[in-house]
């Protein structure tokens, strides 16, 4: 019952983000989410792209053109795979450095959130207690109405409506009171966030990290260049084969027109 009341209160008053905050004791880091999303996205593009190429080659036009796109797509896929393998350690190093350099900021923000959470918990407990009291009072008022059901259904319906409206009004008052208390902490959170942003802007670590990030990106570019050159060399035979095939088709079409 306690979990249900807290869930209703949080979703009703603060939205899904607050619910997420309460539910995730050890949320996945932002960097892990970015890396996982990129991996899933690239794999999805590769799989869906191959499906489209396969459908095109199976069509009448694809059979007439005979471009061998599927074979070339597999070649391209293996080339991109090698590129990912070569860049993997470099990007992993970049994300690790970024996470390490911003660890102090995440710790400070987590402290602020935990502090607000602890201050809000007594109000949530109070709301739960009032919720239980109102539900029990509602049940007691409904209990005698059950015996009157066989006597007068319309009269019972009227009583039910009155009791339901009274219960709704009481819970609305309790919810408004809880929302007002949460509003105070929302203002505090905004002030804390503004203060943290000011600290971040003027923090020597951030200025130092800007230089480090530039160095990391420069290193990433230098290490990625050989892999990108390899990708370009792998693509050239594919592009040349397509170009030769298309030019051959154009020449053949010209001959037929001139004949």
Swiss-Prot record:
GO terms for cellular component: cell surface; chylomicron; cytoplasmic vesicle; discoidal high-density lipoprotein particle; endocytic vesicle; extracellular region; extracellular space; extracellular vesicle. Major protein of plasma HDL, also found in chylomicrons. Residues 1-18 form the signal peptide. GO terms for molecular function: amyloid-beta binding; apolipoprotein A-I receptor binding; apolipoprotein receptor binding; chemorepellent activity; cholesterol binding; cholesterol transfer activity; enzyme binding; heat shock protein binding. GO terms for biological process: acylglycerol homeostasis; adrenal gland development; amyloid-beta formation; animal organ regeneration; blood vessel endothelial cell migration; cellular response to lipoprotein particle stimulus; cholesterol biosynthetic process; cholesterol efflux. Pfam families: Apolipoprotein. It is found in: Secreted. The modification Methionine sulfoxide is found at residues 109, 189, 236. It comes from the Eukaryota. SUPFAM superfamilies: Apolipoprotein A-I (SSF58113). Glycosylated. InterPro entries: ApoA_E, Apolipoprotein_A1/A4/E. Keywords: Cholesterol metabolism, Glycoprotein, HDL, Lipid metabolism, Lipid transport, Lipoprotein, Oxidation, Palmitate, Phosphoprotein, Repeat, Secreted, Signal, Steroid metabolism, Sterol metabolism, Transport. Sequence repeats lie at residues 67-88, 89-110, 111-121, 122-143, 144-161, 162-183, 184-203, 204-225, 226-236, 237-259. Coiled coil: none annotated. Residues 67-259 are annotated as: 10 X approximate tandem repeats. Participates in the reverse transport of cholesterol from tissues to the liver for excretion by promoting cholesterol efflux from tissues and by acting as a cofactor for the lecithin cholesterol acyltransferase (LCAT). As part of the SPAP complex, activates spermatozoa motility. Homodimer. Interacts with APOA1BP and CLU. Component of a sperm activating protein complex (SPAP), consisting of APOA1, an immunoglobulin heavy chain, an immunoglobulin light chain and albumin. Interacts with NDRG1. Interacts with SCGB3A2. Interacts with NAXE and YJEFN3. Belongs to the apolipoprotein A1/A4/E family. This is Apolipoprotein A-I. It comes from Rattus norvegicus. The gene is Apoa1.
């Amino acid at each position: 019952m306690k979990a249900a009341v807290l869930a209703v209160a949080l979703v009703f008053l603060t939205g899904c983000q607050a619910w997420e905050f309460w539910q995730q004791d050890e949320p996945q880091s932002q960097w892990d989410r970015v890396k996982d999303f990129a991996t899933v996205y690239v794999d999805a593009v590769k799989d869906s792209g191959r499906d489209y190429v396969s459908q095109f080659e199976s069509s009448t036009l694809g059979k007439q053109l005979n471009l061998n796109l599927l074979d070339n797509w597999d070649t391209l896929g293996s080339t991109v795979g090698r590129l990912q393998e070569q860049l993997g350690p470099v990007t992993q190093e970049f994300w690790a450095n970024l996470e390490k350099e911003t660890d102090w900021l995440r710790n400070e923000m987590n402290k602020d959130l935990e502090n607000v959470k602890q201050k809000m918990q007594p109000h949530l407990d109070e709301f739960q207690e009032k919720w239980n009291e109102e539900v029990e009072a509602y049940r007691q008022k409904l209990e005698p109405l059950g015996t009157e059901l066989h006597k007068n259904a319309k009269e019972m319906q009227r009583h039910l409506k009155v009791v339901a409206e009274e219960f709704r009004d009481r819970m609305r008052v309790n919810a408004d009171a809880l929302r007002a208390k949460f509003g105070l902490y929302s203002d505090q959170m905004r002030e804390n966030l503004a203060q943290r942003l000011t600290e971040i802007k003027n923090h020597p670590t951030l200025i130092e990290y800007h230089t480090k990030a530039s160095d990391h990106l420069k290193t990433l570019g230098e290490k990625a260049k050989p892999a990108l050159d390899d990708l370009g060399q792998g693509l050239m035979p594919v592009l040349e084969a397509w170009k030769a095939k298309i030019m051959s088709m154009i020449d053949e079409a010209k001959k037929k027109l001139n004949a």
